[in-house]
């Protein structure tokens, strides 16, 4: 038998039918649903008189529009409230395997909630009307975002039409240095291959450095695969995967667990499997990263300086750099560690799990928010993350440092709720996109790891965490 990549195995096991042009009907195991991309899909079902094809495939929560403060006041924005209320009504009418409504302890960002509930399992196909669904590939699953029309198709038929991507292996060999996190690895890779480097590919991340990551770290990495242009990112199953999934609410039990684990252990790329493209990086080359521009690929080591567009020979790239520096209010040659920040945001589906909060708390402990920093928002990814963090006393560390301990939600990752930047504010953010206006009109976003964000919060500027004993 021909050696197969992990992507081959996941894809082939879910093909229902293939047309001559390569288009396939792909079966979907898990459908994650939130309030923003589901209303039109549910409305389409109603108009056609259809029901959900498989109620037990749907796991849902409200996240994008939910406020992360003043929960006693409810949702103040009328459009946000309408979307959340509509999700409540639709789930009540159509059903779901599980639903975690606004203010429920299980509620949270869909890409945090799914894995912690065991709704994401190795070998699954996972879709959601959200581009960062690639997060779930960390479990040896085939996961990617879909559009609203595909949300309806999945609800009605349990399938989507798709064409197979090319396969890419990105291996990071060696051991990561102290202070370097999965977020730094993700940003470094994007800086090397560009935001279009993975276009048309499904990326498998491998190598010693990747295998050494926790599941939280792997989720961060796969979350950012979309920012490299890929449709999906994935990591092969190993004992770390299995240990994380065990005893989760929706994980198999007893004999079913034993059979599942036996199968899950096959979810690795075979020896000799051929990828369409491969990259290999040395872990020792990776330093803590900071983005300086308006694309995730505009990223450098913390020890670097803002680049000079005049040194770029490609006129298109040079123009893009000039525009980015103008928007970001930066001058070429400025050391990154001299750039001050106004706001710090630690959260999002990229970095809001308890491991991320522990990293931030380790920096914040016995320190105070810098005087020039206006706000520091700490937003746990779910109610369960919040609960665990409070058990460990992380909330007290943040509050004593002068940070804001918030309720779970997508928060300042995107300007779709009350948490947003104002024009000109510069933010050290653990989110995944630094596009113009992403966090608010005129807001300036720098992507960093949770530890780097916490360091910026207490020093008032971007700071190499390795210099902070």
UniProtKB/Swiss-Prot annotation:
CDD domains: IPMI. [4Fe-4S] cluster binds at residues 349, 410, 413. InterPro entries: 3-IsopropMal_deHydase_lsu, Acnase/IPM_dHydase_lsu_aba_1/3, Acoase/IPM_deHydtase_lsu_aba, Aconitase_4Fe-4S_BS, Aconitase_4Fe-4S_dom, IPM_dehydratase_rel_enz, IPMI_cat. One of its GO terms (biological process) is L-leucine biosynthetic process. Its EC number is 4.2.1.33. Binds 1 [4Fe-4S] cluster per subunit. Belongs to the aconitase/IPM isomerase family. LeuC type 1 subfamily. Heterodimer of LeuC and LeuD. Catalyzes the isomerization between 2-isopropylmalate and 3-isopropylmalate, via the formation of 2-isopropylmaleate. This is 3-isopropylmalate dehydratase large subunit. It comes from Neisseria meningitidis serogroup A / serotype 4A (strain DSM 15465 / Z2491).
């Amino acid at each position: 038998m021909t050696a197969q990549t992990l992507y081959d195995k996941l894809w082939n096991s879910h093909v229902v039918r293939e047309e001559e042009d390569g288009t396939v009907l792909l079966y979907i195991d898990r459908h994650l649903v939130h309030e923003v991309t589901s209303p039109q899909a549910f409305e389409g079902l109603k108009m056609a008189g259809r029901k959900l094809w498989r109620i037990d495939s749907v796991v849902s929560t409200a996240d994008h529009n939910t406020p992360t403060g003043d929960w006693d006041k409810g949702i103040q924005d009328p459009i946000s409230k309408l979307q959340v209320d509509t999700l409540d009504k639709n789930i009540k009418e159509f059903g779901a395997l599980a639903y975690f409504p606004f203010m429920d302890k299980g509620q949270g960002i869909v890409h945090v909630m799914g894995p912690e509930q065991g709704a994401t399992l190795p070998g699954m196909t996972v879709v959601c009307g959200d581009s960062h669904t690639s997060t779930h590939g960390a479990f040896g699953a085939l996961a990617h975002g879909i559009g609203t029309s595909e949300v309806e198709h999945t609800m009605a038929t349990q399938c989507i039409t798709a064409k197979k991507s090319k396969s890419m292996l990105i291996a990071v060999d060696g051991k990561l240095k102290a202070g370097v996190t999965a977020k730094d690895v993700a940003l470094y890779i994007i800086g090397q291959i560009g935001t279009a480097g993975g276009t048309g590919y499904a990326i498998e991340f491998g190598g010693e450095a990747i295998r050494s990551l926790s599941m939280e770290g792997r989720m961060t990495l796969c979350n950012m695969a979309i920012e490299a242009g890929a449709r999906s990112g994935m990591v092969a199953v190993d004992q770390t995967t299995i240990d994380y999934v065990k005893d989760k609410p929706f994980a198999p039990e007893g004999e079913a667990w034993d059979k599942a684990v036996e199968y899950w252990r096959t979810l690795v790329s075979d020896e000799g499997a051929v990828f369409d493209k491969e990259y290999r990086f040395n872990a020792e080359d990776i330093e803590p990263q900071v983005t300086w521009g308006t694309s995730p690929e505009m990223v450098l080591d913390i020890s670097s300086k803002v680049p000079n567009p005049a040194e770029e020979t490609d006129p298109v790239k040079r123009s893009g750099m000039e525009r980015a520096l103008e928007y970001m209010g930066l001058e070429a040659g400025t050391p990154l560690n001299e750039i001050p920040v106004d706001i710090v945001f630690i959260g999002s589906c990229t970095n809001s799990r308890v491991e991320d909060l522990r990293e931030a708390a380790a920096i914040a402990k016995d320190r105070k928010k810098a005087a020039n920093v206006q706000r520091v928002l700490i937003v746990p990814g779910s109610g369960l993350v919040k609960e665990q963090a409070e058990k460990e006393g992380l909330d007290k560390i943040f509050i004593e440092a002068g940070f804001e301990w918030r309720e779970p939600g997508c928060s300042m990752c995107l300007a779709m709720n009350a948490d947003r930047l104002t024009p000109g504010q510069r933010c050290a953010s653990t989110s995944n996109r630094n596009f113009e206006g992403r966090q608010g009109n005129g807001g300036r976003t720098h992507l960093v790891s949770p530890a780097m964000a916490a360091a910026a919060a207490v020093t008032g500027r971007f700071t190499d965490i390795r210099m902070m004993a």
